């Protein structure tokens, strides 16, 4: 192969096997695995598809990729039509491969297939199954019952929603639903629903309720559907209905319960003590609404922000209280402090150092120092520390200070603000016992004096500090456009926007100003002239109308 030919193949290449297309097939059998560039392969649409264009080929482009010039679209099945007493659900469309589903209206049974697919039949496509039929459901003769009968004995057949009613013989009680109806199960078969009733002789025993007494309904013998009313004894509350009924199974229902109408068992709150006076006893009972107060033991604090109380609730339970959590003292820095001895006052807690703990420690000078953990989580006389220097001074917004690599006791730093900001607070702070004092100042934005024409400011200064508020008052004869009160914001601007004071226009002059604005908006002199003529005519008509009104008024007086 020549060098030119090799380069040609390397640059343009060949095409591999053509892709498998779901909608088209090669027009002839192919045994090749690669194809020269510019090769054209003829294709035909697969069964179920029809041509959508004249070109039906694959073309091998010079770069070794196939270009698809085939357009085949799915064939469409005919509309299946409407299903009497049912419906046809089209899942997507009527195209090849699509599916439709058939279902019957309530009370009808489907005879035939419930689905049909658009499939290949011969050279075209058609539905796999014909339109089914929906026929009304029918039930057999209603079942007979012992000691009773139904009213449908004269009927020959029963269709969907037909019903019959049962009646018991004398001295028997009907249990269940007196009427049953012809229904459809699984859209395939007609059945009677619900189950037919039964006719029984029912007697219930003498009713008893713990901590309750019968209030009404006394009888020697209780039969089915007889009722009794109960009331609870003093100190108990009724849970459920106070009226019970003799049921079909010979029992009473619903069973009432008389519960103690108070809270009991004072809750034990972790790490807290009860302070309610007089002090309650464990065996006491507490009406709904009773409040018990607790206080955290030394070295503990409330676990939440809720009050340290529990309340006897309407459901006769005590409200929840998380109790108290430990207050731990901070752990001394092990890099600078050497703890010699640690005496734990209360071993059973999760704190490294807890209320009452005492530590003995030394610094580089080997002087023995002691500190005790207090109940509020602080050390006395101070947190064990050997540091004499301070951390970096606090950074402030829009301000700066001269930085240093270290800050020892009595070191001072001075803050200054950026241009456009004013320093509020002490400019100089000092390092004192590992803390900066006093608090760092703030740099607040400065706003320029608002320019107000025809008005005055409540506070007249050249500059205003951030958050400062100013009130604007317009001169007599002028009205304010905007907010009367404005505030200097953190970006050095006034918020809301500075208002304006404009001359108040009497109502009689409004049409004059409107005419003036109209003249300013007209594009050329001819339009202005025309507008003036119209305006003049309008004024003359108004003047004439005034004269007519005046004449009418004179005539009335005469």
From Swiss-Prot:
Compartments it resides in: Secreted
UniProt-annotated glycosylation sites, renumbered to this chain: 31, 177, 186, 469, 491
A GO biological process held by the record: single fertilization
GO cellular component labels: acrosomal matrix; acrosomal vesicle; cell body; cytoplasmic vesicle; extracellular space; outer acrosomal membrane; plasma membrane; zona pellucida receptor complex
Keywords: Complement pathway, Disulfide bond, Glycoprotein, Immunity, Innate immunity, Repeat, Secreted, Signal, Sushi
Cleaved signal peptide residues: 1-13
A Gene Ontology molecular function term of the record: complement binding
Keyword Protein transport: no
Positions of the Sushi domain: 14-74, 75-136, 137-201, 202-260, 261-326, 327-388, 389-445, 446-503
Recorded coiled-coil stretches: none
Subunit (UniProt): Disulfide-linked complex of alpha and beta chains.
Protein's job: Controls the classical pathway of complement activation. It binds as a cofactor to C3b/C4b inactivator (C3bINA), which then hydrolyzes the complement fragment C4b. It also accelerates the degradation of the C4bC2a complex (C3 convertase) by dissociating the complement fragment C2a. Alpha chain binds C4b. It also interacts with anticoagulant protein S and with serum amyloid P component.
The name this protein goes by in its record: C4b-binding protein alpha chain
Organism per entry: Rattus norvegicus (Rat)
